[in-house]
From Swiss-Prot:
SUPFAM superfamilies given in the database record: Ribosomal protein S20 (SSF46992)
UniProt keyword rRNA-binding present: yes
Protein function: Binds directly to 16S ribosomal RNA.
Family annotation (PANTHER family): 30S RIBOSOMAL PROTEIN S20, SMALL RIBOSOMAL SUBUNIT PROTEIN BS20C
Protein name: Small ribosomal subunit protein bS20
Pfam family, one: Ribosomal_S20p
Coiled-coil region(s): none
The entry's keywords: Ribonucleoprotein, Ribosomal protein, RNA-binding, rRNA-binding
InterPro entries: Ribosomal_bS20 (IPR002583), Ribosomal_bS20_sf (IPR036510)
């Protein structure tokens, strides 16, 4: 249990940030999921549109330290390469 007033405030701040970050992480995962579902269904046009929405979501999450920037870039790259495979 926090003893000092500053520690209590820090605890409140952490709780608020955690809630915000959870929301952002969920939103990011949802956008990635739509891309993966489109890829799984074999619909290239839908996958391209979904990736156009997912890429900014991933990069925003990376800017806000929800995921590492390299992890976000890697995810975008792998999704894009999977979409490229659909065209062949």
């Amino acid at each position: 249990m926090a003893n000092t007033s500053s520690a209590k405030k820090a605890t409140r701040k952490i709780a608020r940030r955690t809630a915000v970050n959870k929301s952002r992480r969920t939103q990011m995962r949802g956008s990635v999921r739509t891309v993966e579902e489109a890829i799984a269904s074999g619909d290239r046009d839908a996958a391209v549109k979904a990736l156009a929405n997912a890429e900014p979501a991933l990069m925003r999450a990376a800017q806000r330290n929800i995921v590492h920037k390299n992890a976000a870039s890697r995810k975008v790259s792998r999704l894009a390469s999977r979409i490229a495979q659909l065209g062949k």
